[in-house]
Amino acid sequence: MLALLAASVALAVAAGAQDSPAPGSRFVCTALPPEAVHAGCPLPAMPMQGGAQSPEEELRAAVLQLRETVVQQKETLGAQREAIRELTGKLARCEGLAGGKARGAGATGKDTMGDLPRDPGHVVEQLSRSLQTLKDRLESLEHQLRANVSNAGLPGDFREVLQQRLGELERQLLRKVAELEDEKSLLHNETSAHRQKTESTLNALLQRVTELERGNSAFKSPDAFKVSLPLRTNYLYGKIKKTLPELYAFTICLWLRSSASPGIGTPFSYAVPGQANEIVLIEWGNNPIELLINDKVAQLPLFVSDGKWHHICVTWTTRDGMWEAFQDGEKLGTGENLAPWHPIKPGGVLILGQEQDTVGGRFDATQAFVGELSQFNIWDRVLRAQEIVNIANCSTNMPGNIIPWVDNNVDVFGGASKWPVETCEERLLDL
């Protein structure tokens, strides 16, 4: 535009210089296209109007008008460029959201940001087309975005598939939880059954132990059992339930097998209030076997610490304190003045395997019997020698008339136990 204006001004000045018009002549300035400048075509004379402006003023006014037009066009171009930049930014964002699809289409389209034509009308038209193109592309991208959201093959379907997958996982989880609950219930039932079985077994064992301790176990016959005292302690012992009446004579017989040496300990003891050693048979340390009556002592010539079964009998009478000692049916010793004229006091406690320091208690482990006892019988008279022989050689089974050896009359404590005993003949073979 500025070049066109300069050409017009130069043409007018040249014409004025050549023609040298007379004073008062007028010139008209007309905008010509670029090709008319070089053609050299003369311009028609324009009639002059009275009172018109001078050529300089008209030229100045035209220049100002053209300048204003240029400024307006610059402002329009600036506004259009700003709009283009804004739309281009939106387009870039939309193309980014569309995953690059619109960018591919835009790359093959026309470049709307190239050099602009110099004609203002063309510029405006070109800008309008560019804006329309940008709007169309923006609408296309928005349409694609809406299609992406609503299209059944993309996110919506993915969301549905995800929901289905989550539902399937939830059902699997519920099934697994149900299986775990079933396994837990089954395990609880098995545990309960196992616990009940264990408790039943323990109860049976406890009942068996109780029966053994109380002597309620069944043997071939009531006297076919033995008491086992395997350790030298102060808590393993047997107890005769019945007590003794007042006695002026007695015979005590038993079978024993000692497992300790030296000293078999105390096979039995009878204590009454005021006298813990009313009747005691004991072998302590390297001392010989002793019979105590009312704490009076008689040494017996018996030897039973070889670990074999032996049949032992002792007799006593208050008359002159006479006593006898038999081993395996043979009389090995006799004596007198053992607590003469002293009756055996009634109501005491008869213990197997321990020596009593008080009635029924205060046992001393060093005096405990270790081994097995059986056929412990007490009579209230002195048995004849032949009777003792017959008992010892298994010819006669004669229970004591005061204390018989029967299962329900013997309790065991502290780990002592009752077991079936060997037959009398088997014990004889062990002599």
UniProtKB/Swiss-Prot annotation:
GO terms for biological process: associative learning; chemical synaptic transmission. Binds 2 calcium ions per subunit. The keyword Heme does not apply. Residues 1-15 form the signal peptide. Its cofactor is Ca(2+). GO terms for cellular component: extracellular region; glutamatergic synapse; presynapse. Brain, pancreas, liver, heart and skeletal muscle. Highest levels are seen in the testis. It comes from the Eukaryota. GO terms for molecular function: carbohydrate binding; metal ion binding. Keywords: Calcium, Disulfide bond, Glycoprotein, Lectin, Metal-binding, Secreted, Signal. CDD domains: PTX (cd00152). InterPro entries: ConA-like_dom_sf, Neuronal_Pentraxin_Related, Pentaxin_CS, Pentraxin-related. It holds the Pfam family Pentaxin. Glycans are attached at residues 148, 189, 393. Ca(2+) 2 binds at residues 355, 357, 367. Disulfide bonds join 253-313. It is found in: Secreted. Likely to play role in the modification of cellular properties that underlie long-term plasticity. Binds to agar matrix in a calcium-dependent manner. Homooligomer or heterooligomer (probably pentamer) with neuronal pentraxin receptor (NPTXR). This is Neuronal pentraxin-2. It comes from Homo sapiens (Human). The lineage of its organism: Eukaryota, Metazoa, Chordata, Craniata, Vertebrata. The gene is NPTX2.
